[in-house]
Regions:
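Oxidoreductase cofactor-interface core, primarily capturing Rossmann-like NAD(P)-dependent enzymes
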Residues: 8-11, 16, 39-41, 129-244
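N-terminal Rossmann-fold cofactor-binding loop
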Residues: 30-36
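Residues at the starts of beta-strands that form the adenosine-phosphate
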Residues: 2, 25-28, 118-120, 166
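SDR active-site strand-loop-helix element
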Residues: 6, 32, 80-81, 121-127, ...
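N-terminal Rossmann NAD(P)H-binding glycine-rich loop of SDR-like oxidoreductase domains
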Residues: 1-26
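NAD(P)H-binding glycine-rich loop region in Rossmannoid oxidoreductase-like domains
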Residues: 3, 31, 46-106, 110-113
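Conserved Rossmann-fold NAD(P)-dependent oxidoreductase catalytic core, especially the SDR/UDP-sugar
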Residues: 90-98, 102-145, 168
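Acidic-histidine catalytic/liganding microenvironments
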Residues: 23-24, 49, 157
């Protein structure tokens, strides 16, 4: 199968690509980002590096024809372009909204006509994202509602696609990995777990889940953190690997 990984230079995307390189069901990986995507470290002896193609797109609001040609015929897209809560302070909220919502809508609208049928579109959101604006969380409320709007946009587009698009919304809590948690991040994660009540998932688990759903089919449209841990753990166990 041909897989698009959008936002391919990011923290989770790097692990998605690393695992995908060793997945025999995936024959082509288009790594879509603003800058070139490097081969992940520790790809492993079973990795087929020839499957990976870096696709640079300078403007996610308007895809040039050269980029569209690279994406054509894809069977699935794992969408990992977003602004995290820690990045919010570095930009105006309208800019964060554009990156999270507008880029996603333009992406699915651009890819779908070019893709195979069915086209599995996996959008990575967050555990506290809220589709119902009347239930706005008390922490980062506007951000959580905006991310919920992104989820709804993907689901609404898929519902109107006459079966062309099979959507999946992944809602992870805190994403952890070996070596990531220094003193500052330990404090942040403690606050996230105790104050906000965020669950935790390993980076290897969410990556394995996204790949499993892209290759084998969508179990359900919304995957909560507990689903990511369960599916990812089973997928890693089946491949003989362990979670990070």
């Amino acid at each position: 199968m041909k897989l698009i990984v959008a936002g391919s230079t990011g923290f989770v995307a790097t692990e998605v690509i690393r695992q995908a390189l060793s997945n025999p069901s995936i024959t082509s990986i288009k790594a879509l980002a603003r800058r070139p995507t490097a081969v992940p470290q520790d790809a492993g002896p079973g990795a087929d590096l020839s499957k990976l193609k870096s696709v640079v797109c300078d403007d996610f609001e308007k895809y040039p024809e050269s980029v569209k040609q690279e994406l054509a015929g894809a069977d699935a897209c794992i969408w990992l372009i977003a602004i995290t809560p820690s990045q919010l302070s570095k930009m105006p909220f309208p800019e964060a909204r554009k990156i999270c919502l507008d880029y996603t809508v333009t992406g699915i609208e651009t890819m779908t006509p070019l893709a195979s049928t069915p086209f599995r579109f996996l959008y990575t959101s967050g555990a506290n994202s809220e589709r119902d604006a009347t239930k706005k969380p008390w922490v980062l409320g506007d951000f959580c509602v905006m991310r919920g709007q992104c989820e709804s946009a993907v689901l609404d587009y898929a519902a109107k696609s006459q079966g062309k698009v099979q959507p999946c919304i992944a809602k992870p809590g805190l994403i952890d990995a070996p070596g990531k948690t220094g003193p500052f991040m330990s404090i942040v994660q403690t606050i996230g777990r105790t104050v906000i009540g965020l669950p935790k998932v390993q980076r290897s688990e969410i990556a394995a889940t996204l790949l499993d759903q892209a290759v084998n089919g969508i179990e359900k449209e919304t995957l909560l953190n507990e689903d990511l841990v369960r599916i990812g753990g089973n997928a890693l166990a089946g491949s003989g690997k362990t979670g990070e």
